[in-house]
UniProtKB/Swiss-Prot annotation:
Homodimer. It comes from Streptococcus agalactiae serotype V (strain ATCC BAA-611 / 2603 V/R). InterPro entries: ESAT-6-like_sf, T7SS_ESAT-6-like. The lineage of its organism: Bacteria, Bacillati, Bacillota, Bacilli, Lactobacillales. Coiled coil: none annotated. This is ESAT-6-like protein SAG0230.
């Protein structure tokens, strides 16, 4: 049997932290992608080609991680709603 010791509000606060983390990761990737363009304009050769290939290979994984954090946010919000509704349902049964 599972046990959740967090209140719905605490779960919502945690969910928001995941959204904040996702946005931070997206912001960093945007800045680094812009910087990559600057480097691209000023560095020619096979060394840069390898550098750019590595960056381009990893960028989608970073984007996927940011999306995963958003997905976790949504899951936590749903859990908070379920906990809140379950508590309300139990309370209404006791008060009958």
């Amino acid at each position: 049997m599972s046990q959740i010791k967090l209140t719905p509000e605490e779960l919502r606060i945690s969910a928001q932290k995941y959204t904040t983390g996702s946005q931070s990761i997206t912001d960093v990737l945007t800045v680094l992608t812009q910087e990559q363009a600057v480097i691209d304009e000023n560095w020619d050769g096979t060394a840069f080609d390898s550098f750019e290939a590595q960056f381009n290979e990893l960028s989608p994984k970073i984007t996927q991680f940011a999306q995963l954090l958003e997905d976790i946010n949504q899951q936590l919000l749903k859990v908070a709603d379920v906990v809140e509704q379950t508590d309300s349902d139990i309370a209404s049964q006791i008060n009958k």
